[in-house]
Every structure is written in C-alpha cells, then in structure tokens.
Amino acid sequence: MIKLINLSLVLSLLFSLTAFNLIAQQNMTNVYGRRMQSLNGKWDAIVDLYDQGRKNKIYLNKKPENKTDFYEYAFENGLRLNVPSDWNSQMPELKYYEGTIWYGRKFGAVKASGDRLFLHFGAVSYRCRIYLNGQEIAQHEGGFTPFQIEITDAVKENDNFLAVEVNNTRRVDAIPAMAFDWWNYGGITRDVFLVSTPKIFIDDYFVQLDKIKADKINAHVKLSDKLANSSITIEIPELRLKQTLKTNAQGEVKTSFISKEIKRWSPAAPKLYKVKISTQDDQIEEEIGFRNIWVKGEDIFLNGEAIFLKSISFHEEIPQRKGRAFSQADAVVLLSEAKALGCNMIRLAHYPQNEYIVRMAEKMGFLLWEEIPIWQGIDFENESTKEKAGKMMGEMVARDKNRCALAFWGVANETQPSEPRNAFIRHLIATCRAIDTSRLIIAAFDLVRFNKEKQTFVMDDPFTKELDVVAVNKYLGWYHSWPVSPDKAVWDVAKGQPLIISEFGGEALYGKTGEKDVASSWSEDYQETLYKNNLEMFKHIPNLRGTSPWVLFDFRSPFRFHPTNQDGWNRKGLISDQGYRKKAWFLMKHYYDNK
C-alpha cells in the first residue's frame, strides 16, 4: 500500500511538472478583440508580510473536514481588494506596503466543446505566481506587460479556485531596481480575463504600412499551431482589399497590399481602418492606422513631412485618487489634459502603460514613445536582469506593434556609459528589431555638460550613434544652474541626428507665490521663470526636433521628502495633484500652439 501511495505521489508530481510550463506565455495579439469572460471585481485577499503563505500552501484553500481540522487562514470573510487596482490606494495600512499579498476568487468557466481557454492578466505588479485549483500553473516577473496561461485541461465548469501570489518587493536584479522616482504600486493592476478560442486560432498578426512607401501595406499572420496549407483571409473593407492565402509549414502567411487610396494616420487626422482576419474557425477584427515614420539627417519625417514633436510625459496614475490608472475613463482623464496642452506626442513614462491609454491615444491623434523601466541603477552586468529586460521589451513590442501611434521604442533612461550597459541596451534594440523594424529607437540621456573652454553644451556618450533619435533630460534652473544666460546657450549635442529634450522643468506647489528667481521658494512664479528660460534656450539648439516637459501631473514618489512642499509628491507637474493648472502650463500651451 505504501509503495502504491508513493507511486501515486510521483505520478501526480510528474503530471504537475509537465502539464504546465511555469513561465507564463506571451500574450496573444488583441485580447480585447476576442471572446472574453471578465474576472474583474472584488477579490478576497490575505496580507502575507512574512511570506508564509506558500510554505503553508494557502493556495489549496482547504476547509476543515472533521472535528479536529482547522486552518490558520481563510480567504473568505476577510480583506477584499478591487481588481484591477493597486493595493496601496485601497487601504491606508497598505499605502507603503512592500511584500506579498494573496488574491483569491472562485469562478465558473463557459467553454464550448473543442474550444481552448486562456487566463489573461493585463499586468501584475511586480512578480507573481498563479495557482488554479491548488496547482501552480505559472510565474511572471514584470509589472507592466501582459501574459497568459492556457488552462483548457485544468479548468472545471464550476467551482474553480484561482489564487494569485503577488509581491512588489524591490530587488537589485529587478526592473526597475531598488530606487525609482515613482510609487511602488503593488497588486493586480490591470484586467483579468478568461479568453476563449477555437482549437486552432489566430495567435498573432502584424499589419502596418511600409516604412517608406505610402501605398504598400505589409501583413504577417501566425496561427497558434504549426499547420501548413490552412486558409487565412485578410481584408480591409474600406480600401476594398482582400486576400486569401495558404499557411506555410510554420502556420504563417506573409503578404502585401497595394492601394493608392490609403489615408494615412496623423495627429491632425487619426484615421483608422477596420481590418478583418479570418480562418475557417476563427475571426478577429481590429482598427489599425497606417503611417510612415523615418529619420533623415537631423529631421523626423511623418508621412513624408518633417515634424516637431510637441510632447508631454505622465505616469499611469490618477493623482486625485492617489492610485494607478487602469480604465478607459482614466485614459480619457489623462489624455484630455495632454490634448488641451496642444501636444501631438506622449512619452509614456517610464514603463508600458495600459492598453486603454495606448488605444485611446491613437484615436485622439497622439504619437507615442513607449519604454520599459530601464531607469538608473540597473545592474547591467547581471545576465538574469538582462534576460528579464529582453522579455519585458518583447512583451511590450508584441502587445503594441499594431498601434500606428507608436513611433518610438525607448530602450533606456539616464544610464551611465559602460561596456556592460552598451551590451545590455544592444540586446534590447535587437529584441525590438527582431519583431518590428518600422519604429524608431530612442533613449534618454542625462549626461549633457557645459564645456567652459568651448562655452558649449556637449555630451560624451558614443552610444548615441546607435540610436535613430537622441533624447536628453536636462534640468537647467533646477538640478543644474545656468552657466550662461539662456539666449547665449550653445548646444553641440548629437550633431547630425534629431534631438529631443525629453525632460526639463522644476517643482512648484500649486497656488504658492514667491520670488521668481529663487528655486527654494517652490513657487509657481519660479517654475514659470524656469520654463521661460528653457524655452528661450530651445531657440538656439539647431537639431532640436521635439520637447517633452517633465511632467503633466504632480505624482506620488517616496523620493520626495520635503514635509510642506512635497510630502511624498514630485511637484514638477504642470498640473497639480488636484487637477489645477499651474502658471507654467500656460507658457507651454502658448509655445505648442505656435510651433
């Protein structure tokens, strides 16, 4: 009997190890265009400060079976947390919490015969383990990109128990690492869905205008399985374009369409076309725009015309709520203020933001710069960190490669030159270009210095030559004093390439008045002067092709210690945490309206 029990345990263990690849899968393209069942709502939760939950197997969700049974945990009748949302903003006790919280909920699965079922997470911050009906089925690291797990053979029609172990502890090998200038939100911060597909489904596609040609659309579609000689139809009805093709041995088709009637997407006219992709068993629809973007010399060309990028940055945060933005309504709040400022581009700082923001930005006519949080302090010599970064970059590009608004893939922010850093960033660039060669590669540097001998601003980082566009963060008048008057500031940075000032500005407490030439006044008057000086300097940068003030809204940050002027907020916003526009906002509005 003992031998039989042991054999049973071994077989059970082998099944559990082989039934699931514990590394979560990269998400299928366009989850929001699939058949979905939402798992959003109130979830039960357990705060696990000492990380005892896994050791005690609380994911089994056991209940007493006899008079002597008891368990020192229960998901029911305790803490309940909203999903999607961060946990920090839901309870005062969790405001600064860094550690593990377990989420749990029951669900039934609606699955037609022959269908496959996937569990989709828009993002979980920062690392997580997923358990279904007592079995660990996946792990994922990275707080800003989607992932999925196939649960077709593990799910029951009724009474499934899903547990998610979430941990947001900062670590040296994480991305971002130990210190970063925004709030360390933890939790299931984006949508959770059950996604139903046919047995063989349309897994991935990439439909975009050629990088240069205005009349050529390139399309690549891949099935979920390596199935040859299967028919795939691609159609753009408004352009009267339609092709049916046979898959190769990899289950893929590649083709091109030619049309002289394509109206190209631009910030002034954000035209999108309905694209239909179908097989015998599956069909998916998507709105896709078509545009060309390239660099020539010191200029950036959109649809063949040189463009000046009137940008702004914001965090994925609703300051009035002091929490993560996660809904379409939140996207409207953030993007409407960017539109009011007169922007034609947004730098989504400093991580991939949710799909509602990306898709809404495209419809509203914003170009986008998207990046993963390679933000200072990254351990560039750690191979594990490098692998994580590559995976995050791949997940970001895969999710948003069909968004024509995406113009720039950002690969770094404020990093120090070294061979390990260069190798690390080259790995990210290669990851991007393996998926998508149509976008421009950009990075933001903070190494511009004033050369007293030449009386010129210069930057010593040869890596700029490996980028399509160079960006600079420079806080003159705030972290750096003015070595010359703004009208005498001469720049010799990234000569021969387009240059964007990707961050500038300073802090001001809304409503506070003070001396306009004293930084420590923390006043709107000083912030206004600072902006005037920077805008004057910009006139004298010959290859300047865009500006992006830091930042649209005040945002939460434990970096910021001043008890009266900051109180845990970075006050560089043009708009206060309560939604009021500061004096500098009106300066930028005038500047953008006249560019």
Language model features: what each stretch is:
Residues 29-34, 205-208, 264, 276-339, ...:
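N-terminal carbohydrate-binding accessory modules
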Residues 131-137, 237, 280-281, 303:
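Short strand-turn-strand beta-turns centered on an Asx-Gly dipeptide
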Residues 155-159, 222-296:
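Extended acidic/polar, glycine-enriched regions
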Residues 29-30, 46-50, 93-201, 226-227, ...:
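Accessory beta-strand-rich segments of carbohydrate-active enzymes
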Residues 199-226, 595:
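Surface beta-strand/loop "capping" patches
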Residues 23-88, 163-165, 171, 532, ...:
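Accessory carbohydrate-binding/adhesion or oligomerization-edge regions at the termini
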Residues 220, 333-335, 345-591:
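Substrate-binding/catalytic cleft of secreted carbohydrate-active enzymes
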Residues 1-27:
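Bacterial Sec-dependent N-terminal signal peptides
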